[in-house]
């Protein structure tokens, strides 16, 4: 009935390592019904984001285990700060632009519009480099990288 009413249902669950598997894999608890009923299954994991010795946030990795709407087994990492900055809007966009051919990584620097700039400098002032037109191109790259067709 939820599908007919176009209402999404979000279910959270825990995962565990499969014992005795040849390749280490994660499995959801609660039986196999959820695996077959779900349209999308995303596994989340996190690691600490540090500034020196202080923990300032988390790096959250989302891996698509099953999806009827997008490509499976794709990873996306999101940075979440604990302070007022919250979710980092620009984290991971440098790598996405490199995959899509928007810019090149040459000897640890990104070549943008004929200039070579370090990633730290780009992330210090992201509004200067991630303009509206660049963000539209990155959106197109993300659509081809993560969705079907």
Indicate residue ranges for each PLM-predicted region.
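Phosphate-binding/switch region of NTP-binding enzymes
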Residues: 1-100
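Terminal-proximal interaction/regulatory segments of ATP-powered molecular machines
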Residues: 105-149
């Amino acid at each position: 009935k939820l599908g007919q009413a176009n209402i999404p249902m979000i279910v959270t669950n825990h995962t565990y390592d499969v014992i005795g598997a040849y390749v280490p894999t994660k499995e959801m608890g609660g039986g196999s019904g959820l695996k077959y009923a779900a349209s999308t299954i995303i596994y989340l994991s996190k690691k600490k984001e540090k500034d020196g010795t202080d923990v300032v946030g988390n790096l959250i990795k989302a891996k698509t285990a099953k999806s009827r709407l997008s490509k499976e087994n794709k990873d996306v990492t999101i940075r979440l700060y604990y302070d007022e900055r919250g979710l980092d809007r620009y984290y991971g966009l440098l790598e996405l632009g490199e995959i899509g051919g928007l810019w090149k990584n040459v000897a640890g620097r990104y070549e943008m519009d004929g200039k070579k700039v370090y990633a730290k400098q780009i992330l210090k002032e992201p509004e200067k480099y991630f303009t509206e037109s660049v963000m539209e191109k990155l959106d197109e790259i993300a659509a081809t990288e993560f969705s079907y067709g």
